[in-house]
Regions:
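Domain-length cofactor-binding catalytic modules of enzymes
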Residues: 2-29, 37-43, 50-56, 64-68, ...
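Glycine-rich loop/turn
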Residues: 34
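Active/ligand-binding-proximal structured segments within catalytic/core domains
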Residues: 71
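Iron-sulfur (Fe-S) cluster-binding segments and ferredoxin-like electron-carrier domains
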Residues: 82
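Long, basic N-terminal domains or extensions that often function
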Residues: 104, 110-117
Length: 256
């Protein structure tokens, strides 16, 4: 397969192989974005592809600036995995459909307010709470085919005898509202992390992260109750890294 780590230029790394085709526009966006002020390092994942001015599937490291436009509108987009009590040997499509019902169940306005009383922009997006969204977002039942490290599978509570429920979703309209607000105020320029604007963005960003995570819980909740699920793992896309002192934090690039 060849070397999977390539460095086409200083400060840029591609995680790929010679056999993997990458879109030229995505690589162009990667190089252009890497020249933005305060970006000291850029890394592209194997699934890199063109986005709205910035590549999707890449990570960028900064030390002083935050780029809301680079992070994108689907703040907190990620995947959570639960193991259900549904047995793999007893799979029946009709029965599963009846047991699981509708995976997209919006919450009422009062439920949203009680869950997130401090997130003001959310009041405009109550209709999206508890829903999956579009694009490549999904909720699906999965089955383990091969376990490569049994100790890790046991540690996070996964086995081949039960079905797993995976939910891929983000912050829905909330993340877009946060991004739109900052684009109207500051355009695509970077924000100094310790400035009032930077702190304001980080507060809203972290609220959207918490909302996105709990929204995946809400999507799975009806099926958690019915199937006695236990959440095994959560993974979040994390493409801009900002470091201050010894405490780095991570944020994602753009909605898929």
């Amino acid at each position: 397969m060849g070397n999977s780590i390539q460095q086409p230029s200083a400060g840029i790394t591609l995680i790929t192989t010679p056999e993997l085709w990458l879109e030229g526009e995505a690589i162009k966006q990667l190089h252009t974005t890497a020249t933005l002020p305060d970006i000291s390092y850029a890394a592209a994942m194997p699934d890199i592809h063109p986005g709205r001015g910035y590549p999707v599937g890449a990570a960028f490291f900064t030390t002083q600036l935050i780029y809301p436009a680079l992070i994108g509108g689907d703040i907190g987009c990620g995947m959570s995995l639960w193991q259900t009590s549904l047995k793999t040997h007893a799979m029946n499509q009709a029965k599963l459909i009846k047991q699981l019902g509708n995976l997209d169940q919006p919450l009422s306005a009062s439920e949203c307010t009680s869950l997130w009383p401090d997130i003001q922009p959310l009041q405009q997006h109550n209709y999206a709470s508890g829903t999956i969204g579009g694009g490549n977002h999904f909720a699906e039942l999965q089955m383990l085919d091969t376990i490569y490290v049994a100790e890790i599978a046991e540690q996070i509570g996964l086995n081949k005898q039960h079905l797993q429920l995976m939910v891929h979703s983000g912050s829905r309209g909330l993340g877009s509202a946060i991004l739109d607000k900052h684009i109207r105020q500051f355009g695509h320029q970077g924000l100094i992390a310790d400035s009032e604007a930077g702190k304001s963005y980080l507060t809203q960003h972290n609220q959207a992260l918490a909302y996105a995570r709990q929204n995946r819980e809400l999507i799975a909740r009806p099926h958690t109750d019915k199937s006695a699920c236990t959440r095994a793992k959560t993974s979040r896309h994390q493409p801009q890294l900002y470091r201050s002192g010894l405490h780095p934090w991570r944020k994602r690039l753009a909605a898929p």
